[in-house]
Swiss-Prot record:
Gene: GFA1
Protein name: Glutamine--fructose-6-phosphate aminotransferase [isomerizing]
Active-site residue list: 2
PROSITE patterns (UniProt xref): GATASE_TYPE_2, SIS
UniProt function note: Involved in amino sugar synthesis (formation of chitin, supplies the amino sugars of asparagine-linked oligosaccharides of glycoproteins).
Catalytic activity entry: D-fructose 6-phosphate + L-glutamine = D-glucosamine 6-phosphate + L-glutamate
Chain coiled-coil ranges: none
Glutamine amidotransferase type-2 domain ranges (all copies): 2-303
Domain SIS per the UniProt entry, residue ranges: 377-516, 544-689
Pfam families found in the cross-reference section: GATase_6, SIS
Family annotation (SUPFAM superfamilies): N-terminal nucleophile aminohydrolases (Ntn hydrolases), SIS domain
Keywords, comma-separated and alphabetical: Aminotransferase, Glutamine amidotransferase, Repeat, Transferase
EC number, as in UniProt: 2.6.1.16
Length: 699
């Protein structure tokens, strides 16, 4: 939800047109997060103020606006410059130019801000600021942050105190409640950016002209005075001495000074710094990144970078350094290549992505599984009294799909929770519980909040994510990276099958000492050995699925998807895909529940997708299907090849047979293909479904 991008060049000559194109391209890389408007700022012809270039609609429209404006000479070259940009997903205020970021404090752009997240107390702040004479141009919560910054700046001047950008932003953050990330720029502080992370992801990219000679930054903790709560509404303002930082403005050779927590660029060596909410916006520029922690404040100033904390070390313990890490993602992985959409590209990548999930973790010769991320905690997980999965959306379905297998192999009670409902109930969590948090991004707000709740209860917390450096991957005790590669399409496809595989591997490793289960484990591992080639065979169904989607089905108003056992979660996931990108109402039902109400919907107009696989529950599944046939239902059948002859008279998609607990990996792919081809047939953009965001980072 929303995307942030920032760029600063120091002693690196760039034309303003180059800078503008870097900003727009950065936004294009994070389009998939979901948005309805976009914008960026760049210094105007005075080089002392900013021009804001904003648009409702697609990021590409910024190119035309940029080229038609007159306040910025795009041919002008600058040696030092900062700029911030944003894609907005409306939460407060409708999509409009006025509500698009960057948002400003005043007509002089004394402070500009881009923001991801929600300021929950913005109404109270707005009332206070209006009483102080501020007027608002937007309906957003974000504008309060910009005007608060100007308010604190004026307070410092009124008190004849030294004004300092970091001190100002610290006080803004102290008075804003909620989960958010900010990046501030200011006409009062040229060539400076201040970035804040508070429960919303931000990372910093570093691109020096030469090789980096260090691999971490020191962290400057605040003064004890920073720990005292302050409120504009009921107490005087307090500025601690620790909020004043004197930064070396000389640009010298690159060194690391842990005491000052500052990166110095000496001898006018060029340095480019990037700020982003997602690594996808950085990889074409640099592989060197810093993942920020909650309550980190980063000051980028004239070639210097320093990291500060909101509070003193007495109040919050934590690492005293931030490592510079290398991201391994290739640029080609986030490009569409020859495909029309990312979604169909990612569906077709599943043959390879499931192999990447298993690579180095399963030995098919010795039939052993080893998950390095769990090895130090395997014993603790095995000793758990119960296992709980907490997830949202597709990740919830992947967890549900593996519940029966985990119960079978581990002989431990397993429950699967929707993260938001879990938070609403705040159920009792014991120290003897093991809780898995499954999230493609590792930043899903409800899952992160649930993680912190479970940590506070003393449970052993495990992360299953697709994003290195994400909040869940950092804050859990251990975990598994699914290695699916970047997933750009909003509707998750390859992440689902990789999560599915990863959870199967978890079940296999945790049960490796159970002698009674060894035959079953071998059967599953033999199935995993062939799963990639079987996926390839299923992908060959794309043409026949497309033919069905291009027919009358695209005009259907509603669909039911029915399955039993391992196929029930598959139906739920397929229904979600159809809802997400075709806007057709779809519902996944358990076949055993059909006669308890849903059968009342069946008539000769309702299209029903049945998943039938030759497993222990097939006879019961077949009985449910007969009830549908008897009432004139119009079935589409996804079945395994050994029973395909039973459904020759219906529209049928035949998939290879595998072990029952893996069958859902193969039966979900026709549903992914169907949702994609239906969306295209209806004229919708499968990559950017309306009202949806890829990474839901607000509650």
């Amino acid at each position: 939800m929303c995307g942030i991008f920032g760029y600063a060049n120091f002693s690196k000559e760039r034309s303003k047109d180059e800078i503008a194109n870097i900003m727009i391209n950065g936004l294009k890389r994070i389009e998939y997060r979901g948005y309805d408007s976009a914008g960026f700022c760049i210094t105007d012809n005075t080089d002392r103020n900013f021009a804001r270039i904003r648009a409702v609609g697609k990021v590409n429209s910024l190119y035309e606006i940029k080229n038609s404006q007159t306040s910025v000479d795009l041919t002008r070259k600058v040696l030092n410059h900062v700029s911030i940009a944003h894609t907005r997903w409306a939460t407060h205020g409708q999509p409009s130019i006025e509500n698009s970021h960057p948002l400003s404090s005043d007509e002089n752009n004394s402070f500009l801000v881009v923001h991801n997240g929600i300021i929950t107390n913005y109404k109270d702040l707005k009332v206070y600021l209006k009483k102080k004479g501020f007027t608002f141009e937007s309906d957003t919560d974000t504008e309060c942050a910009a005007k608060l910054a100007l308010y604190f700046y004026r307070e410092m001047e009124r008190k004849k105190e030294e004004t300092d950008f970091v001190a100002i932003v610290k006080n803004v953050v102290k008075h804003c409640e909620g989960a958010f990330a900010f990046v501030f720029a200011s006409s009062l502080f040229p060539n400076e950016l201040v970035t804040v992370r508070k429960s919303s992801p931000v990372l910093i990219g570093l691109k020096p002209s030469g090789k980096m000679s260090f691999d971490f930054f020191g962290v400057n903790y605040g003064d004890p005075a920073d720990d005292t709560p302050t409120s504009l509404l009921d107490s005087p303002l307090a500025f601690s001495k620790s909020d004043r930082h004197g930064f070396d403005q000389n640009i010298d050779m690159m060194t690391r000074d842990v005491q000052d927590c500052t990166l110095h660029a000496h001898n006018k060596e060029p340095l480019e710094v990037f700020v982003a909410s997602d690594a996808s916006a950085l990889i074409e520029h640099t592989r060197k990144v810093i993942f920020l922690e909650d309550n980190d404040i980063v000051h980028i100033s004239n070639g210097n970078i320093s990291i500060h904390r909101m509070h003193s070390k007495a109040k919050e313990s934590g690492p005293e350094i931030r490592e510079v890490k290398t991201i391994e993602t290739e640029l080609a992985a986030i490009m569409k290549g020859n495909y029309d959409h990312y979604m169909i590209k990612e569906i077709n990548e599943q043959e390879e992505s499931v192999v990447n999930t298993m690579r180095g973790r399963i030995n098919f010769e010795s039939l052993t599984v080893s998950l390095g991320g769990l090895k130090d905690h395997v014993s603790g997980i095995r000793k758990s009294q119960r296992i709980i999965f907490v997830a949202c959306g597709t990740s919830y379905h992947a967890s549900l799909a593996n519940r029966a297998l985990l119960e079978e192999l581990l002989e431990i009670p397993v429950s699967v929770e929707i993260a938001s409902d879990f938070l609403d109930r705040a159920p009792p969590i014991m120290r003897s519980d093991c809780v898995f948090f499954v999230s493609q991004s590792g930043e899903t707000a409800d899952s992160v909040m649930a993680l912190r709740y479970c940590m506070s209860m003393g449970a052993l917390c495990v992360g299953i994510t697709n994003t290195v450096g994400s909040t869940i991957s950092r804050e859990t005790a251990c975990g598994v990276h699914i290695n699916a590669g970047p997933e750009i399409g909003v509707a998750s496809t390859k992440a689902y099958t990789s999560q599915y595989i990863a959870l199967v591997l978890v079940a296999l490793q945790l049960s490796d000492q159970n002698l009674v289960k060894q035959a079953r484990r071998r059967e599953i591992m033999e199935g995993l050995k062939n799963i990639s080639s079987q996926i390839n065979r299923v992908l060959e169904l794309s043409t026949s699925v497309k033919s069905l989607a291009n027919g009358p089905m695209k005009d259907d108003a509603s669909l039911l998807l029915i399955g039993r056992g391992y196929q029930y979660p598959t139906c739920m996931e397929g229904a979600l895909k159809i809802k997400e990108i075709t806007y057709i109402h779809a519902e996944g039902l358990a076949a055993g529940e059909l006669k308890h109400g849903p059968i009342a919907l069946v008539d000769d107009k309702l299209r029903i997708i049945f998943i039938a696989t030759k497993d222990l529950l097939y006879d019961k599944t077949r009985n449910a299907m007969e009830q549908i046939f008897a009432r004139g239902g119009r079935p589409i059948v996804i079945c395994t090849e050994d029973i395909s002859g039973d459904y020759a008279e219906y529209d049928t998609f035949v998939v290879p047979k595998t072990v029952d607990c893996l069958q859902g990996i193969l039966t979900v792919i026709p549903l992914q293909l169907l949702s994609y081809h239906l969306a295209v047939a209806k004229g919708y953009n499968a990559d950017f479904p309306r009202n949806l965001a890829k990474s839901v980072t607000v509650e």
